[in-house]
Amino acid sequence: MIKHNLCPFAKEAISKQVTYRVFDGGDTDPFSSPSGALKSLTKVLKEELSELEAFDGDGATSFIIAPSMFSGDFQKYMDFVNDDVSDLLTNLDLHGTIQVAPFHPHFMFGGTNQNDPGNKVNQSPHPMFHLLREVEVSAASDQQDTQKIWERNERLLTKLFRC
């Protein structure tokens, strides 16, 4: 991501306040009790969202990595993001304040096929949630033409992965 400048905003963020949190299922085995693990994951997301909102410096960002959750099921992961995470942002009154960017080993943007090189931008070794403050995303977007970034990334990823 940083080496190839896929996200020009990432390099600066890495030098600031970054939190990485690995979620292993909490007190619940995600395989024997998936609903309990989802509740635990939602609790971790809520805690991290609250901490990110309360942080008063610049450049704060958080990653919640969930290697034992959703790894084989991209659709369930996206359902969780679109339903549960969205509801959590609403309940905490954080829509427009914090956004959650989804990353997954099998990530696919809507309207693309599995081999589309643009999907690589949001693919990761494990399912994870990237929490970003909107004010910083907006400031970074104001400094860059995001459409040109996307087009450049697609060309680069096509070249790198020969898709």
Residue ranges and their predicted role:
Residues M1-C163:
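Expand to "…catalyze enediolate/carbanion chemistry for C-C bond making/breaking, isomerization
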